[in-house]
């Protein structure tokens, strides 16, 4: 079933706006425009929109945290490609949604806490899950936020670092999916040319709004949007 243009445009602009605040990638698109039927488009939008977002906050990017995620993410992308033909996607999306909702609720309830790095194996598993999710669902952003919240204390650092991780994650996913012939090039690129300016507009609008929001309020907004993204993912179990 096709998504009405007005609704799709709203979802795209919302994703760009959402992305500037928090950088969560496809979460808003998934909720607003039926993500599971447009994964190639979402991933292709992730790269330029996240580059714009990251460029606007370049000085606050924490590169060491990105380097710690990269190896597991690359391996996870290959695992995700294999899993695409093996699993019913509804249950993984449901479980992911529960986890993201829990992370958002914990952040909303407890506020700012000292960053505590995850144990080595747990961090690598989470990094691998980022690659799996980006390839299978184009919605790894909430998981990236959950990981970075355990490594970075300042919300501004998280907001700046997430889109850089998403540029890399989406680039890996695009390479893997193109190599496997999983992206319909003709239709996807045609829609991409139309959707990209709308996503950029959302990023710019979010940029202006974010200047007037204090860090505690930004952290609460992050938590609320994580909860919204998580709950939207759980709905796929009944579709």
Swiss-Prot record:
Provide the protein name: Probable inner membrane transporter protein TsaS
One GO cellular component term = plasma membrane
Induction (UniProt): Constitutively expressed.
Query: Where in or outside the cell?
Result: Cell inner membrane
According to its UniProt entry, the function of this protein is described as: Involved in the uptake of p-toluenesulphonate (TSA).
Q: What is its main location?
A: membrane
Question: What does the record say about its membrane topology?
Answer: Multi-pass membrane protein
Name the protein family. Belongs to the 4-toluene sulfonate uptake permease (TSUP) (TC 2.A.102) family.
Q: Which InterPro entries match?
A: TM_pro_TauE-like
